[in-house]
Amino acid sequence: MPQHGRHAPRRGSMGFWPRKRASRIYPRIKTWPKIEEIKPLAFAAYKVGMTHTILNINGERVFTPVTVLEAPELLVIGAKAYKKENGALKEISSLYFNDLPQYVFRKIPKLKNYNFEEKKEQFLSKADNADEVKIIVSTQPWKIKLKKTPEIFDIPIGGSDVNKKLEYALSLLGKELSINDVFKEGQYVDVIAVTKGKGFQGVIKRFHVHRRQHKSEKGVRKVGAIGSRGPGRIFPTVPMPGQMGYHRRTEYNKLIIKIGEPLNVEGGWVRYGQVIGPTILLKGSVPGPRKRLIILREAIRPPRKQEKVEGIEYISLSPKN
């Protein structure tokens, strides 16, 4: 307890525990909203940078920082059928399309000799008993000259009729999904990404612990005490040095300001280059550095009072440092 008589809450939130590195550079999503419309529940885009705009919100001119995302089309490369067992979904069958770009084989080499027609019959026979259907999508970073190896992940389909969802998933095989097929302007989405990695950091930067006085014993940038149980048994709430950043994080209810043509600043975006594909403007900030994949999900708990953007008066295209 502090001895100065003022309120001093403990440092760091146990809501973000354990503070360890994410298992991969793009996130896995386990929680999805339920909607009636039959459509994919998520999309993916690459973070470009930030700029500022002047928006007309509820009749007022509002200076608003926005994040720019580049969203090339997603390629639907397969479908998966799931069965509920003991309260969890278990995969019972999967199907992949046969005519795919060569870059997809970097991620899944076994698809080079995949017999689509034979696997399709097996998939349909097992999918009749499915409780859930998801599509398997691949990003296409080569279309925006970002890199060659794609990210591959599953996206659930909205709706309650499994047969209709299965039919919809099969109709998408081998086709491309655009951002306009999933989201629209003025809609709220959740953004899920892996944050910037900071490496191994001390308690001052990691937990914002105050520096000790200059005459303190055995160090200044350290915690004063680690508990009464001794160094052999330390509570998990005690600030300790360790990994900072590169964590999977979710931010709720980001407003889509605009979906449109490529948006470039003078001289190109710093540490990114020129935007080639469709652009998304999101109100506020987004986790992760430039070029990182951001998953946009249907808002799982949208706000009751929703802002209405009546127009965009100005978008800053000045060089960004």
UniProtKB/Swiss-Prot annotation:
GO terms for molecular function: rRNA binding; structural constituent of ribosome. It holds the Pfam family Ribosomal_L3. Keywords: Ribonucleoprotein, Ribosomal protein, RNA-binding, rRNA-binding. InterPro entries: L3_arc_euk, Ribosomal_L3_dom_3_arc_sf, Ribosomal_uL3, Ribosomal_uL3_arc, Ribosomal_uL3_CS, Transl_B-barrel_sf. GO terms for cellular component: cytosolic large ribosomal subunit. One of its GO terms (biological process) is translation. It comes from the Archaea. One of the primary rRNA binding proteins, it binds directly near the 3'-end of the 23S rRNA, where it nucleates assembly of the 50S subunit. Belongs to the universal ribosomal protein uL3 family. Part of the 50S ribosomal subunit. Forms a cluster with proteins L14 and L24e. PANTHER family: 60S RIBOSOMAL PROTEIN L3-RELATED, LARGE RIBOSOMAL SUBUNIT PROTEIN UL3. HAMAP family: Ribosomal_uL3_A (MF_01325_A). This is Large ribosomal subunit protein uL3. It comes from Nanoarchaeum equitans (strain Kin4-M).
